[in-house]
From Swiss-Prot:
GO terms for molecular function: ATP binding; proton-transporting ATP synthase activity, rotational mechanism. GO terms for cellular component: plasma membrane; proton-transporting ATP synthase complex. This is ATP synthase epsilon chain. Belongs to the ATPase epsilon chain family. Produces ATP from ADP in the presence of a proton gradient across the membrane. Signal peptide: none annotated. The keyword DNA damage does not apply. Its main location: membrane. Keywords: ATP synthesis, Cell inner membrane, Cell membrane, CF(1), Hydrogen ion transport, Ion transport, Membrane, Transport. It is found in: Cell inner membrane. Transmembrane segments: none annotated. Pfam families: ATP-synt_DE_N (PF02823).
Amino acid sequence: MAKLHFSLVAPERELFSGEVDMVQAPGAEGDFGVLANHAPFMTTLREGKVTVKDGATTKVFDIQGGFADVGPEGLTILAEHAVEAA
C-alpha cells in the first residue's frame, strides 16, 4: 500500500510528521479521510479528533479548528490548537 506524507502543525510546534496509511479529520462540513494519491483539496477544520493510522498503530490528536491542505506531497494540517490525546 502506498504511503501518505502527513504533517500536523500547531502554533507552538510540529506534533507529527511522517509517512502513514490514512488520516481521518473533522472537516467543517463533515469528517473526511485521506489516503495516498488523494485528489487535491483544501478545507477548514472544526474542533474534533485527527486519527492517524499506520499499519496496526493508531495515534489520535485533539484539535480546535484549523485548515487542511491535501496536495501532491501529502496532507498538512495547520491547527489552531492541538495536543496528542491521552
